[in-house]
Amino acid sequence: MADSCTMTTDLNIPLFERAKAVIPGGVNSPVRAFNAVGGTPRFVRRAQGAHFWDENAQQFTDYIGSWGPMILGHGHPEVMAAVQAAALEGFSFGAPTEREVVLAEKILSLMPSMDMVRMVSSGTEAGMSALRLARGFTGRNKIIKFNGCYHGHADALLVKAGSGLATFGASSSAGVPQDVVKDTVVLEYNDVGQLEEAFAQFGDQIACVIMEPIAGNMNFVRASVPFTRRIRELTREHGALMVYDEVMTGFRVALGSAQSLYAQHIEGFAPDITVLGKVIGGGMPMAAFGARREIMEKLSPLGPVYQAGTLSGNPIATACGLKTLELISEPGFHDALHAKTGRLMAGFKAEADAAGVPFSVDHQGGLFGFYLLPELPSTWTEVMKTDGARFNRFFHGMLERGHYFAPALYEAGFVSAAHTDADIDKTIEAAREVFKTL
């Protein structure tokens, strides 16, 4: 078993104590601390393919993949070679390079909704910049976001729903003044009625609606086609922009990202601004936002909307991202990934049913989610009904058997091209044992 070390021999424990003395909570991103599930985080020493090894040299099958970027698995030889070659040429220049132009051209070839793209270093930075651009382009201040959707930790987006439309949102973090979020309206995801009410009340004041097509911080909730269509209709009618946050879904759920899937159901569908991250960096700090030319030309140095970054378009990150996008563009890549992820989820569902455990699953491409609920939820309110204590037992049961899932109830999971049938079979077998204990 992967968690067989005793309290005196588990090397993760003293390392976590050292970390807590010098890093707030012992981690550099809160979910890594295991606060939601209890226990000690696994400190990773190395990773290869679909696996990583912790400080005890214990192997785990990895179903978070650095929270999404590692679509090819860890240490893909062609990606490693590209990164090593780029590193030999220099780490960072603070000047443009041909490679960032090639990466931009590659992204635009896969995303027809975008004429131009700007590189940044994180999804938070991309989302924050997209909002500034939307406000600068429209000359308006109000934005609409949805409860349960995460768009990074920019102040204006750290918002939870208030008691009604008239109250707007309420800050969800200390250090974020109410004045900063006073123009953020928070609505229920997939609620067309609330959406229409908001536009009826504030339509000529709304700069943009920002949304995730699949809300991965609600585990896995799809935006319904009618909901997505209505957002597109209302934004066009009122001169607002539709900002599509594909940081998690971009190039992972399909080669054309989630917007290509919705375009199959909504004639002429395209968002105004798209936010990208994770996969486009292949594991390096890289994100981007893009839109049609008239919007992007509002950005400095062409226009009045300021945005800059010391490490934007970093040469090593662009090499990693470019090689990743080249490899996932191979014919059949996403079909195979979707089938592999579906096999994992079907196996989980069958074993949960056999054990009499309420369970629902969904997946798209290499992204998946599951709930200890009899039916898939469609809103944050429904997601909140899932059994947290039972999930924690499931998480630790799988961890003990060497399978690493998100250490939080509401986080999506990720399958990579490196996961083999044998990996998935072993994971399903472990789930069979764990479901029997729930």
Swiss-Prot record:
GO cellular component annotations of the record: cytoplasm
Pfam families associated with the record: Aminotran_3 (PF00202)
Residues where N6-(pyridoxal phosphate)lysine is found: K278
Catalysed reactions, as listed in the record: (S)-4-amino-5-oxopentanoate = 5-aminolevulinate
Superkingdom in the source lineage: Bacteria
InterPro entries documented for this protein: 4pyrrol_synth_GluAld_NH2Trfase, Aminotrans_3, PyrdxlP-dep_Trfase, PyrdxlP-dep_Trfase_major, PyrdxlP-dep_Trfase_small
Cofactor: pyridoxal 5'-phosphate
GO biological-process terms attached to the record: protoporphyrinogen IX biosynthetic process
Sorted UniProt keywords: Cytoplasm, Isomerase, Porphyrin biosynthesis, Pyridoxal phosphate
EC annotation from Swiss-Prot or TrEMBL: 5.4.3.8
CDD domains (UniProt xref): OAT_like
Pathway annotation: Porphyrin-containing compound metabolism; protoporphyrin-IX biosynthesis; 5-aminolevulinate from L-glutamyl-tRNA(Glu): step 2/2
Main location: cytoplasm
Listed GO MF terms: glutamate-1-semialdehyde 2,1-aminomutase activity; pyridoxal phosphate binding; transaminase activity
Subcellular location: Cytoplasm
Protein family according to the UniProt entry: Belongs to the class-III pyridoxal-phosphate-dependent aminotransferase family. HemL subfamily.
Cross-referenced PANTHER family: GLUTAMATE-1-SEMIALDEHYDE 2,1-AMINOMUTASE (PTHR43713), GLUTAMATE-1-SEMIALDEHYDE 2,1-AMINOMUTASE 1, CHLOROPLASTIC-RELATED (PTHR43713:SF3)
Subunit field text: Homodimer.
Name of the protein described by the UniProt record: Glutamate-1-semialdehyde 2,1-aminomutase
The species this protein was found in: Delftia acidovorans (strain DSM 14801 / SPH-1)
